[in-house]
């Protein structure tokens, strides 16, 4: 773990069950770090990382995609977005080079997702507050534990009508 903290190259995977908002989170991370100029949306078929024709047509991630986020240390996301060009040329000791892997959430593409687990330094497990913890979520958790991947849990869609925060917390 200490080696990960001193290394400025990190690989993070974003994993979730289908429709949890994984690609939306990826888009927000890309946008807030200045890597893309506008937010894409799955339902508008313009998500940056879902660029395969089948993915756009079906509205799901089929193939794992990667994007690089260069984040200057000691700045917040808004500062990073405004200084994205500076961050790319900044002293590498002051910049985190994060490779973000957006993985498929549909169970039919689990093999594609599982290939990425062995290279992850960290994972973000996205859970939809409207759907709660799904069977696929439990499978992902077991796989992350098996590969000893430190994991952040991100509960998405908390602002949606009908969300029961206490129920989701109990499921977690």
Q: Where do the model's predicted regions map?
A:
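P-loop NTPase switch module centered on the Walker A-proximal segment
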Residues: 2-79, 91-127, 131-133, 140, ...
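Conserved beta-strand/loop subsegment of P-loop NTPase cores
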Residues: 99, 122-126, 147-158
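GTPase G-domain guanine-specificity segment
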Residues: 157-172
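Intrinsically disordered, low-complexity tandem-repeat regions enriched in Proline and Serine
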Residues: 81-86
């Amino acid at each position: 773990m200490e080696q990960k903290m001193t290394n400025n190259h990190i690989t993070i995977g974003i994993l979730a069950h289908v429709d949890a908002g994984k690609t939306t989170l990826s888009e927000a991370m890309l946008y807030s770090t200045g890597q893309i100029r506008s937010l894409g949306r799955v339902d508008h078929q313009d998500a940056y990382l879902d660029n395969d024709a089948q993915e756009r047509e079906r509205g799901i991630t089929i193939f794992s995609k990667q994007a690089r986020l260069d984040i200057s240390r000691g700045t917040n996301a808004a500062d990073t977005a405004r200084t994205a060009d500076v961050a790319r040329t900044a002293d590498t000791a002051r910049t985190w080079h994060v490779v973000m892997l957006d993985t498929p959430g549909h169970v039919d593409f689990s093999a594609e997702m599982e290939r990425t687990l062995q290279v992850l330094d960290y994972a973000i497990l996205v859970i939809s507050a409207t759907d709660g913890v799904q069977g696929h979520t439990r499978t992902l958790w077991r796989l992350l534990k098996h590969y000893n991947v430190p994991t952040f849990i991100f509960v998405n869609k908390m602002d949606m009508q009908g969300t029961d925060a206490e129920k989701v917390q109990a499921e977690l």
